Swiss-Prot record:
It comes from Shigella flexneri. The gene is norV. GO terms for cellular component: cytoplasm. Homotetramer. Fe cation 2 binds at D83, D166, H227. Residues 254-393 form the Flavodoxin-like domain. Residues 30-210 are annotated as: Zinc metallo-hydrolase. The keyword Electron transport applies. PANTHER family: ANAEROBIC NITRIC OXIDE REDUCTASE FLAVORUBREDOXIN. Fe cation 3 binds at C428, C431, C461, C464. Disulfide bonds: none annotated. It comes from the Bacteria. InterPro entries: Anaer_NO_rdtase_flvorubredoxin, Flavodoxin/NO_synth, Flavoprotein-like_sf, Metallo-B-lactamas, ODP_dom, RibonucZ/Hydroxyglut_hydro, Rubredoxin-like_dom, Rubredoxin-O_OxRdtase. This is Anaerobic nitric oxide reductase flavorubredoxin.
Length: 479
């Protein structure tokens, strides 16, 4: 069944209510998806894109009900990925000589998928036009790496419709086609999820490409995407959101995610979150167990956040596999303007923390101090976690803290004057163990109240057995 988009433009795509995985199993399409194909019937008949390959036969049969396939004059392929051009082989078997208009890179992609170099390819580049009669033209705009090298958009003059390819789309299936007909909360959640998980790596390209398109000074009455809704009501709203999201986007939000073997790291996550909330109640904090949560929801929250705390138990002296995989994915997504801190519990060694901190730094995050706890955290260890959260809230605050929390901090500092007189706490740079002068280290005959300067030179870190030379002043206390 076709749907009139505008005048002589019809949607001839395919809804996919059941799909739950995309890009293999990397993207969870919890609300299904659609594969949008458009038929333009002017003096020349143009088909823009096809559908996913698994619907090839159904697509060609439905298209045959709309038009004699021999009457299709041109096929435009904005993107060669299988969910866009997947039905080409089935269609071209019926009309093998029909010209295909696409970018030079798309020819390589199409042949790589379909293996038909004999098809009638016609290369287009930015600014090229194709006259389709009745005073209307198609104008082509290359958009390489949004999100494949072959990508382009197509603009139809007269009707002022931009066929935008993957940009401005969402994996969202609904019986209605237009943006003003669907649930707005669901729609914009899926738009942001789509951008965060698919287009984030190319944010640096989004703004200049949108600026280039706007530079054509062409009116845009509708944006017809390759997935999800057609934007007919205020279509520029999604363009404005893309410009916002592309500009090193962050909200006053912190995401905490972790994996754990014995719930020890979960206890740390909860305590850290408590400390953040105590110090800055304005900040939104979300906690996820990666083993039980939707990975794409976690990544969307990271995209929205000013910072992320990542927790892992130590297993075989490295981080938990699900954490390693998610950090690798964050590396590929290339988030910008975000801070990070690693935390976790361990038994006899804590190698995961150092490895995790390094990986987060390699992923482009600005790193804050990490935090370790040995075995199951007791009340003292949980208080250290809460204090870590308080310090994170202070360091990552986007605006001056509320006066009530500032007063609390001042009061705590006043009550701790005696402790402060003992000098700073010191942290082992290898295992992150903290020496607190107020507590000393009775196991090595270092009495409570002993400043670091008076600790014997033969002192060894209780965790990793290294000497005083590997200790640094605790970063949160450095002046």
């Amino acid at each position: 069944m076709s749907i009139v988009v505008k005048n002589n433009i019809h949607w001839v795509g395919q809804r996919d209510w059941e799909v739950r995985d995309f890009h293999g199993t990397e993207y969870k399409t919890l609300r299904g998806s659609s594969y949008n194909s458009y038929l333009i019937r002017e003096e020349k008949n143009v088909l823009i894109d096809t559908v996913d390959h698994k619907f090839s036969r159904e697509f060609v049969q439905n298209l045959r009900n709309e038009i004699d396939l021999a009457d299709i004059d041109y096929i435009v392929i904005n993107h060669a990925e299988e969910d866009h051009a997947g039905a080409l082989t089935e269609l071209m078997a019926q009309i093998p000589d029909t010209p295909i208009y696409c970018t030079a890179n798309a020819i390589d992609s199409i042949n790589g998928h379909h293996h038909h170099p004999e098809w009638n390819f016609n290369v287009v580049k930015t600014g090229d036009t194709l006259d389709i009669g009745n005073g209307k033209q198609l104008i082509f705009v290359e958009t390489p790496m949004l999100h494949w090298p072959d990508s382009m958009m197509t603009y139809l003059t007269g009707d002022a419709v931009l066929f935008s390819n993957d940009a401005f789309g969402q994996h969202y299936c609904d019986e209605h086609l237009f943006n003003d007909e669907v649930d707005q909360t669901e729609l914009f959640e899926q738009c942001q999820r789509y951008y965060a998980n698919i287009l984030t790596p190319f944010s640096r390209l989004v703004t200049p490409k949108i600026t280039e398109i706007l530079g054509f000074n062409l009116p845009v009455d509708m944006i017809a995407t390759s997935h999800g809704v057609v934007w007919r009501d205020n279509p520029t709203q999604i363009v404005e959101l893309y410009l916002k999201w592309a500009a090193d986007y962050q909200e006053d939000r912190i995401t905490i995610f972790y994996d754990t073997m014995s719930n020890n790291t979960r206890m740390m996550a909860d305590a850290i979150a408590q400390g953040i909330a105590e110090t800055d109640p304005r900040v939104a904090v979300k906690i996820f167990n990666v083993a039980r949560s939707d990975k794409n929801e976690i990544l969307t929250n990271v995209f929205r956040s000013k910072g992320v705390l990542v927790g892992t138990s130590t297993m075989n002296n490295v981080m938990m596999p699900k954490i390693a995989g998610l950090v690798e994915e964050m590396t590929g997504l290339r988030f910008r303007n975000k801070r990070a801190s690693a935390f976790g519990s361990h038994g006899w060694s804590g190698g995961a923390m150092d490895r995790l901190s390094t990986r987060l730094q390699d992923a482009g995050f600005e790193m804050s101090l990490s935090l370790k706890a040995k075995w199951r955290p007791d009340q003292d260890a949980l208080e250290l976690c809460r204090e870590h959260g308080r310090e994170i809230a202070r360091q990552w605050a986007l605006a001056p803290l509320p006066q009530s929390t500032v007063n609390t901090v001042v009061k705590e500092e006043t009550s701790a004057t005696t402790t402060a007189d003992l000098g700073p706490r010191m942290q082992c740079s290898v295992c992150q163990w903290i020496y607190d002068p107020a507590k000393g280290e009775p196991m090595q005959d270092v009495a409570p109240g002993t400043p670091w300067s008076e600790v014997p030179d033969n002192f060894l870190c209780p965790e990793c057995s290294l000497g005083k030379d590997v200790f640094d002043e605790l970063a949160s206390e450095a002046k």
